[in-house]
Amino acid sequence: MSLESLFQHIIFSEHQAEESRRLMREVRSEINRCREKIKKAAEQLNKEKIQLESKVQQFSEKAFLLQLLKTHENALERQCNEITNQRNMLLQTFEATKRRVTEEEEKFIKEITDFNNEYELTKKRERLMKENVKIQISDLENQANILKMEMKSMEHDSDLLNELQRQKNELIQELSTLQRKLKGFEDKKHEAICTTKYLEAEKIKINEKPQNDAECLRLKKELELYKEDDMQSVHDALQTEIEFLELTLAQKDHQETNNL
């Protein structure tokens, strides 16, 4: 074998070895993938197994509960039948009692009616009712008379109130008149005071004149006519009369308030 042939054989062998290694790697990779799939399948299987066991447990519990419900339903049906029977018996007893009570009531009413008819209690009752009605009518008439008297009293009070109101108005008018007079007197008083002051000043001036002087005598008379004390007495009298009228008005207002 020549060297070139040997060299080609070596290259071909290496190429086969490389191809074998590549195939080996692919096989290993495929084995790993298969193992991973097997692992996932086993995990899924375990999960589904657990779920199945849980569902089986739930089904068993529900089946047990269903059995209990059926048992309870049967017991309720028996109890319902018993209650229905008792109800029917009670209804029959009630109807019988009702008939008996009705008969006793009719019998009692008949006995009462016969007794009343025998001793005339019904007529006595009617007579008592008539007497009560008469008494009530008499009471109502008395109340009506009392109301009439009260109305007359109120009318009298109303007339008295009107009279007091009229007197009040008259007193108010009289008070207004007196107040106007008082104002006039106050004006005259003020004028007299001014005149008095003027005359006093003139008096000082004429003190040196003879007492028999005609002008001096005239001034003295005029001074006495306009003395302040006299005007003050008139003012005080009017003021007293006004206060009396105001007091009278206040008393009448108080009396009207009490009447209302």
From Swiss-Prot:
Location of this chain's protein in the cell: Cytoplasm; Cell projection, Cilium
Top-rank taxon: Eukaryota
Residues in coiled coil: 13-194
Keyword Lyase: no
Record GO cellular component, one term: sperm midpiece
Keywords per UniProt: Cell projection, Coiled coil, Cytoplasm
Subunit structure and binding partners: May interact with TEKT2.
Family designation: Belongs to the CCDC172 family.
Protein name stated in the entry: Coiled-coil domain-containing protein 172
Species name: Bos taurus
Gene name for this UniProt entry: CCDC172
